[in-house]
A protein has these predicted regions:
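Periplasmic peptidoglycan-binding/anchoring modules of Gram-negative envelope and division proteins
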Residues: 57-94, 98, 121, 125, ...
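Short secondary-structure boundary/capping segments
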Residues: 41-42, 80, 126, 150
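N-terminal targeting leaders that direct proteins to extracytoplasmic destinations
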Residues: 1-48, 57-58, 64-73
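Periplasmic OmpA-like peptidoglycan-binding domain that tethers envelope proteins to the cell wall
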Residues: 93-165
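Envelope-exposed proteins and targeting segments
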Residues: 46-50, 55, 84-86, 132, ...
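Second-shell loop/turn segments in exported
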Residues: 52-65, 105-110
Length: 165
């Protein structure tokens, strides 16, 4: 009887161990900077640089001065509060007219949009913005304003976004 009870107990323990989950629980650690970065990006969405002429990376002085008076302090503040491992990305855009890549004597939307981003990057640098925490890129016509005609002039713009390095 004792032997049968002992066998039953050993069998139950073995069964319990075998049925137990061997998967380790993974903890989902959220990025502690996610809320700050999201708030910064929402603020930056309000300040696109617009007004570029077709195939041009030159910003009309009047439009730039008006934009810079309002937006430069915001950009400076955001850069000063960037968490470690993040940069402010300056992104140039183009409308969907013309080729994306260089073709013949056409520079292509990628180059034009990158030149626009560089123009704004350099202008912010001249205004005293710390460019050590900034980067720039051109995306051509691949990111039109949602709901807009991709060929519309308002897609010729420069936007800002806080991104991981």
């Amino acid at each position: 009887m004792k032997r049968t009870a002992l066998i039953a107990i050993v069998a139950m323990v073995a069964f319990t161990i075998a049925c137990g989950s061997s998967q380790q629980v993974q903890k989902d650690y959220a990025d502690p900077n996610a809320a700050l970065v999201s708030a910064q990006n929402q603020q930056l969405e309000k300040y696109p640089v617009q007004g570029f002429a077709y195939k041009s990376s030159t910003m009309p002085a009047q439009k730039w001065d008006k934009w810079a008076d309002v937006a430069t302090p915001v950009v400076k503040e955001i850069i000063n509060k960037l968490p470690d491992g993040y940069v402010l990305q300056v992104t140039g855009h183009a409308d969907a007219r013309g080729p994306e890549q260089p073709t013949g004597n056409k520079p292509g939307n990628i180059k034009i949009s990158k030149d626009r981003a560089k123009t704004v990057y350099d202008a912010l640098k001249r205004k005293g913005v710390d460019t050590d925490k900034m980067t720039y890129e051109g995306v051509g016509s691949s990111e039109p304003i949602p709901g807009s005609n991709p060929r519309a002039a308002k897609n010729r713009r420069v936007t800002f976004k806080v991104v991981a390095e």
